[in-house]
Each structure stands twice: as structure tokens, then as C-alpha cells.
Curated annotation (Swiss-Prot):
Role this protein plays: Monooxygenase that converts norsolorinic acid anthrone to norsolorinic acid during aflatoxin biosynthesis.
Transmembrane feature ranges: 59-79, 105-125, 131-151, 188-208
Family listed: Belongs to the anthrone oxygenase family.
Annotated GO MF terms: monooxygenase activity
Species per Swiss-Prot/TrEMBL record: Aspergillus flavus (strain ATCC 200026 / FGSC A1120 / IAM 13836 / NRRL 3357 / JCM 12722 / SRRC 167)
Disulphide-bonded residues: none
Gene that this polypeptide is encoded by: hypC
Protein name: Noranthrone monooxygenase
EC number: 1.13.12.20
EC top class, as a word: oxidoreductase
Origin: domain of life: Eukaryota
Length: 210
């Protein structure tokens, strides 16, 4: 509660400028100002100004770039310069564990940001479905990994285990084939956050709104 008579001209000007955000303003008989507004609407409008959807587009694009870097640079160089199958498989294993610790987390955070942006838009009555689609598309890289890459991962881990135990070793040709197959599967996986980023960017630019 605040007495309007105690407000300076500058404060009164600010109060008038806030009328677009605070829809329900009541002047009481004793000169007090009571503001009644929906917390969720105020909060989501503030959040929209922070640009949650912009952050989601950036993190999704970063994830795509990191994954595509493996296909364009890292894996081809490893295959070209490695002559020992055990070394190639071990290097792939290090790459896998590094990505396993970071990639899914970035994907889930990006999906959560898109989901939050969708909720914020929904709360103020704006189109929100494309943000949810972008989030689901990005996170879909996780089940894709389980469904389509698990067999190749298992074969490579089995080969590494055999190398460490001194058992039957696979040939360089076979190790190159497995690592190359994983590389292409990973490239397809990178398309999920890429598609999410494209959808998000179209939403940010106002091209797609539904």
C-alpha cells in the first residue's frame, strides 16, 4: 500500500508507464494504491525479456557444432593417422566417455529451456507449440542413442576389453569399420539438436508461430 500523495512526479510518471503490465489498478478512498495482477503473467513477461528461447537456440547450436566437429575433423584424422587397431579403439573410447558426460546433459538443459519458453508463451496466451516441438526434437537424440547406436557401442567396448585382456584382437580394417559406422550414426544424431535449433530460430524470428 502506498499513498499517491507521497509520490514524486517522476514516480507518478513511472506508475502511469506501468499500466500495460499491471492491468488492475484501484484507487481507494483513503488515497492508497492497490495493485492486483496475476503473478504468473508478470513473471512470464519478465522471463520473455530475458530471452529463454534465445539461450536454448544457442545451447542447441553449440551441441550440434560439437557433435559435427567429430565427423568433420576428429574421426577422419584418427582413422587416417592410426595404424594400430587397439589404439584406434582406445581413442574412440576416450571420445565416447567425454561426450557421454557432456552431451546428454546439454541436450536435456536445452530441452528444458525450450519447455520453459513454451510454458511462458502459453501463460500469456501466445503461440507456444513450436517451442515444445523444438525441445522434444532436441531431447530425441537421447532415445536415438539407445535404440540405434547401442549395438555399435557395445561392439567397440567389447573390442577394447579384448585388447586389454590380451584376447582375440579385431583387425585394423574391422576397427575402422566400427568407428566409421559410429561416426555416421553420431552425425545423424547431431541432426536432432540442429533441427531443434532451426525450429527455435524460426520461432525467434517470428517465421513459425503456432
Amino acid at each position: 500500500m502506498e499513498d499517491l500523495r507521497d509520490l514524486s512526479p517522476r514516480d507518478l510518471h513511472k506508475a502511469r508507464g506501468a499500466k500495460e503490465e499491471f492491468k488492475n489498478v484501484f484507487l481507494l478512498a483513503d488515497g492508497e494504491l492497490t495493485v492486483h495482477a496475476s503473478f504468473s503473467r508478470i513473471f512470464t513477461r519478465r522471463t520473455n525479456k530475458m530471452g529463454t528461447e534465445y539461450v536454448a537456440v544457442l545451447t542447441g547450436s553449440f551441441l550440434t557444432g560439437a557433435m559435427m566437429n567429430l565427423h568433420l575433423l576428429t574421426i577422419p584424422i584418427l582413422i587416417e593417422t592410426t595404424r594400430q587397431p587397439a589404439q584406434l579403439v582406445h581413442q574412440w573410447s576416450r571420445i565416447f566417455y567425454s561426450g557421454h558426460r557432456k552431451g546428454p546433459g546439454i541436450a536435456l538443459v536445452t530441452g528444458a529451456l525450450y519447455g520453459y519458453a513454451a510454458w511462458a508463451k502459453y501463460s500469456v496466451g501466445e503461440p507456444w507449440h513450436h517451442w515444445m516441438v523444438a525441445g522434444v526434437t532436441t531431447v530425441s537424440m537421447v532415445p536415438y542413442t539407445w535404440m540405434f547406436m547401442n549395438a555399435t557401442n557395445t561392439a567397440l567396448f567389447h573390442a577394447e576389453d579384448q585388447f586389454e585382456k590380451g584376447g582375440v584382437e579385431i583387425s585394423l580394417q574391422e576397427s575402422v569399420r566400427l568407428v566409421g559406422k559410429w561416426d555416421w550414426l553420431n552425425t545423424v544424431r547431431a541432426l536432432f539438436p540442429l533441427a531443434g535449433s532451426v525450429m527455435g530460430m524460426l520461432g525467434v524470428c517470428g517465421v513459425v508461430r503456432y
